[in-house]
Amino acid sequence: MPVISKASSTTTNSSIPSCSRIGGQLCVWPGLRQLCLRKSLLYGVMWLLSMPLKTLRGARKTLKITHFCSISNMPSSLKIELVPCSKDNYAYLLHDEDTGTVGVVDPSEAAPVIEALSRKNWNLTYILNTHHHDDHIGGNAELKERYGAKVIGSAVDKDRIPGIDILLKDSDKWMFAGHEVRILDTPGHTQGHISFYFPGSATIFTGDLIYSLSCGTLSEGTPEQMLSSLQKIVSLPDDTNIYCGRENTAGNLKFALSVEPKNETLQSYATRVAHLRSQGLPSIPTTVKVEKACNPFLRISSKDIRKSLSIPDSATEAEALRRIQRARDRF
């Protein structure tokens, strides 16, 4: 069985979720999307290719969290809000409507999280960290001191995540206000990287393991570790919502289109992302189904990708992944 699911020879547009308006606001939650993209595919792709590769340094101003729906298509009391933080990072507020329990995933800084909590008049119960890098834990100390929140992270990072209280490891099951959270050990970007999977809400928080159309750098891990970790994402149900650590889809699309320009599903996704970003809306969450159809790091068996990057058929999956990463870094 291959580590990454085999790329299909033909891709269709059925993988791309749509978007809908709820309560007069644009909702970007997969499964509820029915956005009418009247602009042509060519317009969307050309707009995307004309965008500069830069971070969203003004993210808190352009991506106001009040613009985001927190409506789930799952019969769950768990609601999620995106909180833009420094550069292009996202933190995520988790709110259980039944108990009032609130958590935050990967707060790179405290101020925007405090602002969001104050606006909602919420207290913070938990801080969930996927890994130890400062742009995912930078707000820990201030938030813990202010709210008395418990910090949760990998046991591997017990000496690298400030204020950590609850140590978790692969296959652990932790409860967030009655919601089962399965801990996936997902090294590659870092040795202690974990992902938080909420099966009841079809949601996973992946930090810097996987982005829409890309994956994290190998800061501490190996290609083999990254492949194994990505397989854990691929094995989840197709409708699983992926909340990654960054808003970098537009830049990732440029590379993905360059190595697989004939992928029709990717072309359709480019149009949708271009429309969302032109409206100042996030491209996240994505879904497992979309990433399997479009993400070159999950499509390392694609003949088109291998041909584009001169990767021989004899190359192992780990070697192919390494070459794709090198090509992305040079892009």
From Swiss-Prot:
Residue positions binding Zn(2+): H131, H133, H189, D208
SMART domains cross-referenced by the UniProt entry: Lactamase_B (SM00849)
Binding site for substrate: R246, E247, N248
Keyword annotations of the record: Hydrolase, Iron, Metal-binding, Mitochondrion, Transit peptide, Zinc
Residues involved in Fe cation binding: D135, H136, D208
Record's subcellular location: Mitochondrion
First-listed, main subcellular location of the protein, grouped into a coarse class: mitochondrion
Tissue specificity of this protein: Mainly expressed in roots, flowers and flower buds. Also detected in leaves.
Essential cofactor(s): Fe(2+); Fe(3+); Zn(2+)
Pathway: Secondary metabolite metabolism; methylglyoxal degradation; (R)-lactate from methylglyoxal: step 2/2
Enzyme Commission number(s): 3.1.2.6
Reactions catalysed: an S-(2-hydroxyacyl)glutathione + H2O = a 2-hydroxy carboxylate + glutathione + H(+)
Class of enzymatic activity (EC top level): hydrolase
InterPro entries tied to this protein: Beta-lactamase_class-B_CS, Clx_II_MBL, Glyoxalase_II_hydrolase, HAGH_C, Hydroxyacylglutathione_Hdrlase, Metallo-B-lactamas, RibonucZ/Hydroxyglut_hydro
GO terms for biological process, alphabetical: antibiotic catabolic process; methylglyoxal catabolic process to D-lactate via S-lactoyl-glutathione; response to amino acid; response to anoxia; response to salt stress
GO MF entries: beta-lactamase activity; hydroxyacylglutathione hydrolase activity; metal ion binding; zinc ion binding
CC annotations in GO: mitochondrion
Family: Belongs to the metallo-beta-lactamase superfamily. Glyoxalase II family.
Its job: Thiolesterase that catalyzes the hydrolysis of S-D-lactoyl-glutathione to form glutathione and D-lactic acid.
Protein name: Hydroxyacylglutathione hydrolase 1, mitochondrial
Organism this protein belongs to: Arabidopsis thaliana
Gene (UniProt): GLX2-1
